[in-house]
């Protein structure tokens, strides 16, 4: 065994061994418990970042741990390879997105392999592979047959530069997130998936996911947004020219008698009708179309509106209520119209005060009165007043009574609504899965037959940035109609990339199946036992995946209801931010490796200078590693300098996995030093000559007392590390426990046969306990400790129950309740012996100083309190 730890050399040896044996390639073993561990697959952006390293190391630790416990473990890897970034990069570099993507995949695969991940690479997939996305297309056609997929025209956010639809989340201050162009609202036909059909099941299913973080479940429940309320119809005031009735949905029908106007969204048909002969209103509507699109943004922006001159009639009183166009009303919620009750809604209150509209209170607290005039809206529940026949009712009773009356008058009824909207999957981009439809002048929209799938993308196109290149590629869109044989053209929209990631975890189970989307292997492996990824995916990806799985279940393709049994959302990786403000008002960021931080004599940071010029830079504190802040650390540099095991150890030790991790160069150095100490400890043990193994262990009670204590600590460490990995997922405390044990081992000077045997047992078990976290070094050290055997053939260590029973225990000694020392006593010592030993303690003697002892209180196994 070489004396020095050379990580690059030993890591290459370990990986070569794993590759040659194919040890991580999995197959189905029906009589063995399975464990499917999956980290969210990466987008092939070109390089791994530290967030990737953390994510995939967490999954690898759990996979290796379960493997040692006897599970049949699958840990696959693939690439979320379609999407706008590839197209934009291709525009900048003048290369096809396919080439850019596949080159990135090749490089990032080598990076992942250098981390020593226990991945079954035979199952690798890329969503841009036609053999993968053909099944997107096949399932889309099945959904089309079931009415789950359908076409409709809807107002969308349109980026005029990228010439594509943007999700609400991609519109920032009215501008496209990438181009900065002012976003337009357009009515565009597109294809939608009826996720709302599954709204109740998606909501109820959250109750069956105890292994998910409560925060994620709450986010999904809020996104689904089930509301119990009342649909209310406000009839048109024909005399004002109002062309139609307005239907509104409200969860507060108890406030109906306080309605003083009705507000509609800028895209509402009534708004567009009223604007036909009102240029000012038309201009206002256009300005609303360029405003906020998210509820959170709408809540913060200034409330603006304009009267239409049209009126509706109050459904219970017949009062004429003006119709306003308001920028705080979303067309996507309810019917795009709200009944405005300024006294009991904050937005309506602000709007009414700004435009001098009536404010009519009709609810007061159960235990008091409302101030007059109102300084702010009273939004709570209470008791009705000034509400005619509905006065003096508690809010919920008033809701029931008013809903009953409205139904009787055919002016409304109780209704359940959802915030969730059907999923629009059409994208006017090139680098995505083609939608398998053909447009024929004779036959209309015709599905591509199954035997003509996949509809493949031309992979040699180089986008120029002027819209979707598929619309300018006759070799793609020109075709014959599958039904009548006449000239036709293909659909040129592609699918939202969330489609690709909504079922990839199923395809891993049967990646080589060419005749079907899935087979029986999916039901063996699924659901995923442990899914790992960032909380930023809490809503869209995780919700879409749950929906997709339920659709596949209903089509008989899989047998499970929920795709992910347990979910771990890892925290972000943080680093310091350094910058300078330039003369033109911009900010230039510098990577921390380019900066020297200055400290005072006490170690307090007092400044920082750029290495290149020695001039000061400002600190922006700690923030998430990102390209925009230039504060990322290249994992490859860490691996090349310290080895993959050091990177893995630091990532697992620096913070619990669900919390943020602050990057620390000193922490990386510390991890490297620990691995060198581990290597040296085994080296020194081997130098003393050893052909023993832990299987030759001496019975616990035959060890001398001091060695029994050490062996007790060893087996306590096994118990703790097992619990930390199994139940708590706190890898940092597991590592700390092994480090503490290693410190104890380093101090052992005894070279007796018993001590040598215990050292062998302790080192073997330490290597086994650490192997899921730092697999390369442990692989090599095991061969040194147990020549002729392989670590990956070993089971997880089991604690010796006899060793956990301590001969002596340590208890604290107090005087009048204040800690004065600790004593070691025999576990079975009687109270008289405990009292005698406590009173003989030197600190006790000094603190008593001859004072009379009133009594001695002994709490068995815990403490002695001497009262003086």
Curated annotation (Swiss-Prot):
Q: What is its main location?
A: cytoplasm
Gene3D superfamilies, sorted: 2.20.28.290, 3.10.20.590, HUPs, Isoleucyl-tRNA Synthetase, Domain 1
Superkingdom, according to UniProt? Answer: Bacteria
Can you quote a single GO CC term?
A: cytosol
Q: Which InterPro entries match?
A: aa-tRNA-synth_I_CS, aa-tRNA-synth_Ia, Leu-tRNA-ligase, Leu_tRNA-synth_edit, M/V/L/I-tRNA-synth_anticd-bd, Methionyl/Leucyl_tRNA_Synth, Rossmann-like_a/b/a_fold, tRNAsynth_Ia_anticodon-bd
Gene Ontology terms: biological process: leucyl-tRNA aminoacylation
The record's section on Pfam families has:
Anticodon_1, tRNA-synt_1, tRNA-synt_1_2, tRNA-synt_1g
Q: Which GO terms describe its molecular function?
A: aminoacyl-tRNA deacylase activity; ATP binding; leucine-tRNA ligase activity
What keywords are annotated for this sequence in UniProt? Aminoacyl-tRNA synthetase, ATP-binding, Cytoplasm, Ligase, Nucleotide-binding, Protein biosynthesis
Q: Which SUPFAM superfamilies match?
A: Anticodon-binding domain of a subclass of class I aminoacyl-tRNA synthetases (SSF47323), Nucleotidylyl transferase (SSF52374), ValRS/IleRS/LeuRS editing domain (SSF50677)
Class of the enzyme per the UniProt entry, highest EC level:
ligase
Q: In chain numbering, where does the motif 'KMSKS' region fall? A: 624-628
Catalysed reaction equations from the record: tRNA(Leu) + L-leucine + ATP = L-leucyl-tRNA(Leu) + AMP + diphosphate
| Motif 'HIGH' region in this chain | 42-52
Binding site residues for ATP: 627
Cellular compartments annotated: Cytoplasm
PROSITE patterns given in the database record: AA_TRNA_LIGASE_I
The record's EC number reads: 6.1.1.4
The record's family statement is: Belongs to the class-I aminoacyl-tRNA synthetase family.
- The protein here is known as Leucine--tRNA ligase
Q: Which organism is it from?
A: Nitrosomonas eutropha (strain DSM 101675 / C91 / Nm57)
State which gene encodes it: leuS
């Amino acid at each position: 065994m070489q004396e020095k730890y050379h990580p690059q050399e030993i890591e290459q040896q370990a990986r070569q061994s794993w590759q040659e044996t194919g040890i991580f390639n999995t197959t189905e073993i029906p009589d063995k418990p399975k464990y499917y561990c999956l980290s969210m697959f990466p987008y092939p952006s070109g390089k791994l970042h530290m967030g990737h390293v953390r994510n995939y190391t967490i999954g690898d630790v759990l996979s290796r741990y379960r493997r040692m416990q006897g599970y049949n473990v699958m840990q696959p890897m693939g690439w979320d390879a379609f999407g706008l970034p590839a197209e934009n990069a291709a525009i900048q570099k003048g290369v096809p997105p396919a080439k850019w993507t596949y080159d990135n995949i090749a490089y990032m695969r080598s990076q992942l392999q250098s981390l020593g991940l226990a991945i079954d690479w035979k199952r690798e997939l890329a969503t841009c592979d036609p053999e993968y996305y053909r099944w997107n297309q096949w399932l889309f056609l099945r959904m089309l047959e079931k009415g789950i997929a359908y076409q409709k025209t809807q107002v969308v956010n349109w980026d005029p530069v990228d010439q594509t639809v943007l999700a609400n989340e991609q519109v920032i201050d009215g501008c496209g997130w990438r181009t900065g162009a002012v976003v337009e609202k357009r009515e565009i036909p597109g294809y939608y998936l009826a996720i709302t059909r599954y709204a109740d099941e998606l909501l109820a299913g959250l109750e069956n996911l105890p292994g998910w973080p409560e925060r994620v479940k709450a986010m999904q429940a809020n996104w689904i947004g089930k509301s119990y309320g009342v649909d209310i119809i406000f009839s048109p005031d024909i005399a004002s020219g109002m062309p139609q009735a307005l239907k509104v949905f409200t969860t507060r029908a108890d406030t109906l008698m306080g309605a003083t106007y009705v507000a509609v969204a800028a895209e509402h048909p009534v708004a567009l009708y009223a604007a036909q002969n009102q240029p000012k209103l038309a201009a206002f509507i256009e300005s609303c179309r360029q405003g906020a699109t998210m509820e959170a943004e709408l809540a913060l922006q200034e409330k603006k509106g304009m009267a239409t001159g049209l009126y509706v009639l109050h459904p219970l009183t017949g009062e004429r209520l003006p119709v306003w166009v308001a920028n705080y009303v979303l067309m996507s919620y309810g019917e795009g119209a709200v009944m405005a009750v300024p006294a009991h809604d904050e937005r309506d209150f602000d709007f009414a005060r700004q435009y001098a509209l009536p404010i009519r209170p009709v609810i007061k607290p159960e235990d008091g009165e409302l101030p007059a005039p109102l300084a702010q809206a009273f939004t709570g529940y209470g008791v009705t007043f000034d509400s005619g026949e509905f006065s003096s009712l508690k809010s919920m009773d008033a809701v029931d009574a008013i809903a009953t009356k409205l139904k009787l008058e055919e002016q409304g009824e109780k209704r359940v609504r959802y915030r969730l909207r059907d999923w629009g999957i059409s994208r006017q981009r090139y680098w995505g899965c083609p939608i398998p439809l053909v447009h024929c002048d004779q036959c209309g929209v015709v599905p591509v037959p199954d035997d003509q799938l996949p509809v493949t993308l031309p992979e040699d196109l180089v986008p120029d940035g002027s819209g979707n290149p598929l619309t300018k590629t006759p070799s793609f869109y020109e075709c014959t109609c599958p039904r009548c044989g006449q000239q036709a053209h293909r659909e040129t929209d592609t699918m939202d990339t969330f489609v690709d990631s909504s079922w990839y975890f199923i395809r891993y189970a049967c990646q080589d199946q060419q005749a079907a989307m899935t087979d029986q292997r999916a039901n063996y492996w699924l659901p995923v036992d442990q899914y790992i990824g960032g909380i930023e995916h809490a809503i869209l990806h995780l919700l879409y995946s749950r929906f997709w799985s339920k659709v596949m279940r209903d089509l008989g393709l899989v047998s499970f209801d929920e795709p992910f049994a347990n979910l771990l959302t890892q925290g972000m990786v943080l680093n310091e931010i350094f910058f300078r403000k330039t003369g033109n008002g911009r900010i230039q960021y510098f990577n921390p490796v380019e900066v020297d931080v200055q400290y005072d004599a006490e170690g307090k940071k007092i400044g920082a200078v750029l290495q290149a010029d020695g001039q000061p830079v400002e600190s922006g504190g700690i923030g998430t590693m990102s390209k925009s802040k230039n504060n990322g650390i290249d994992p490859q540099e860490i691996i090349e300098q310290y080895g993959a095991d050091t990177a893995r150890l630091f990532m697992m030790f620096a913070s619990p996995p669900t919390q943020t991790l602050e990057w620390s160069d000193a922490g990386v150095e510390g991890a490297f030093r620990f691995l060198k100490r581990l290597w040296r400890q085994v080296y020194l043990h081997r130098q003393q000559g050893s052909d023993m193994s832990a299987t030759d262990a001496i019975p616990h009670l035959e060890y001398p007392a001091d060695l029994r204590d050490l062996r007790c600590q060893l087996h306590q460490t096994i118990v703790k590390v097992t619990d930390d990995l199994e139940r708590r997922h706190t890898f940092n405390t597991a590592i700390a426990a092994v480090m503490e044990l290693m410190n104890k081992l380093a101090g052992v000077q005894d070279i007796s046969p018993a001590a040598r045997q215990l050292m062998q047992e302790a080192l073997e078990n330490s290597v086994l306990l650490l192997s899921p976290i730092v697999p390369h070094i442990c692989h090599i050290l095991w061969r040194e400790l147990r020549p002729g055997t392989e670590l990956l053939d070993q089971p997880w260590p089991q604690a010796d129950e006899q060793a956990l029973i301590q001969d002596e225990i340590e208890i604290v000694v107090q005087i009048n309740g204040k800690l004065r020392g600790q004593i070691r006593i025999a576990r079975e010592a009687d109270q008289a012996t405990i009292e005698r030993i406590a009173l003989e303690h030197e600190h006790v003697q000094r603190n008593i100083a001859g004072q009379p002892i009133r009594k001695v209180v002994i709490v068995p196994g815990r403490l002695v309190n001497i009262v003086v």
